[in-house]
Amino acid sequence: MALEQLCAVLKVLLITVLVVEGIAVAQKTQDGQNIGIKHVPATQCGIWVRTSNGGHFASPNYPDSYPPNKECIYILEAAPRQRIELTFDERYYIEPSFECRFDHLEVRDGPFGFSPLIDRYCGMKSPALIRSTGRFMWIKFSSDEELEGLGFRAKYSFIPDPDFTYLGGILNPIPDCQFELSGADGIVRSSQVEQEEKTKPGQAVDCIWTIKATPKAKIYLRFLDYQMEHSNECKRNFVAVYDGSSAIENLKAKFCSTVANDVMLKTGVGVIRMWADEGSRLSRFRMLFTSFVEPPCTSSTFFCHSNMCINNSLVCNGVQNCAYPWDENHCKEKKKAGLFEQITKTHGTIIGVTSGIVLVLLIISILVQVKQPRKKVMACKTAFNKTGFQEVFDPPHYELFSLREKEISADLADLSEELDNYQKLRRSSTASRCIHDHHCGSQASSVKQSRTNLSSMELPFRNDFAQPQPMKTFNSTFKKSSYTFKQTHDCPEQALEDRVMEEIPCEIYVRGRDDSAQASISIDF
């Protein structure tokens, strides 16, 4: 009976042990799925005491064994012009392994997970004194699912930076060279460092860009420009891409050669880091990031034919957001219309006013060019004195009548009438011209001879005054006088019908360029 009771108790104890072990194994399996994903806050990673001169921290549950599958990160920051010294207590034990691949303590010289690695520590012997080169130190403790140990306890203190002791008060803060971008797409560019004066000329460049995609989206990265001043020298210049965080285990790609490929991230957070030492400041890059979701695509997204769905606002925007240019293939008509519309709205008035001014100036120029030669010809015609030129080469001659074109009709009519009267008077006086010769004596004889000479010197006369030859440059005057009768003092008074002496003076003036010629004809009978 007693033996049976003892067997029953043993069975219960065995079942209890199996149940506890099963629960422990299940818990370890669940914790193992969270490795590298969740960063445990410092409050859950043991004690951390901070002071103005330093502080101390320890692994979880120290001095008891640390739990499995734990990850704790400690970032130490000193004041400007100071560095950090880190020491460990003698009671120290972390699961030993080759190259500390399992449980380990990682220390980096800087504030980030990609800062230069100082070393990895594990085993039973505590590390020696660790000293930073700047005012930051990044420390990570990690444990796997089995073989836990005692852990560690570390102390840190701030010491003066020996590189600045001789400069007397010059501060040495770490360059705040961090940028954040988000949205459907955007540009990451290294020129932003100089534009915002994040670093001084001659200093090394160590900057990061944190990219956040739209909700439930991933990130696609494509280099638009990339050049390393010292190719294939990754210690001097490189561009690194991290997927999810800046932790070293999340490094996706690192470029330091002559070519940089596109990168497709699996999360919605991307970190871009650029490093260039003092002699590599000419290194540069420009990168396009695009938020995308995996198919099936919704009505608000565009299918890129490369397992990507991008926002409709990125289609035909002049930038290739897809891995292949599907989003910009059929946009020629749309681009032309958009460009014309933009020009019409913003510059239509300016273009119209400018075109009007140019048109007016063109018309004025044409008119000036057309009229200018005519003015020259008219000026030459006015300056050229044909009469004076002809007088130089032709012998002088006289004409009986020289009239202006405007007065020729009236003057010719009067002249024709007077000549007719003259001819009639001549015919009527011819029969009785010798009646009174005995009254005048020798004077009558001279008058007779004068009339005879006048008869023999018959002046040429043309009766076709209707169309005379125009005289352009001669300035002539024609003087008319009424018939007058002269008596000699030797002759007695006679009746009006006995008057036989009549004088008709006619003066013809022909003016040249400088002087005038005058001719007068007196006819007596």
Swiss-Prot record:
Compartments reported by the entry: Membrane
Record GO terms (molecular function): ionotropic glutamate receptor binding
Annotated tissue distribution: Brain (at protein level).
Modified-residue entries (Phosphoserine), positions: S409
InterPro entries recorded: CUB_dom (IPR000859), LDL_receptor-like_sf (IPR036055), LDLR_class-A_CS (IPR023415), LDrepeatLR_classA_rpt (IPR002172), Sperma_CUB_dom_sf (IPR035914)
Extracellular side of membrane: 23-347
Keyword annotations: Disulfide bond, Glycoprotein, Membrane, Phosphoprotein, Receptor, Repeat, Signal, Transmembrane, Transmembrane helix
Subunit annotation: Interacts with GRIK2 and GRIK3, but neither with AMPA-nor with NMDA-sensitive glutamate receptors.
Protein name, per record: Neuropilin and tolloid-like protein 2
Gene name of the encoded protein: Neto2
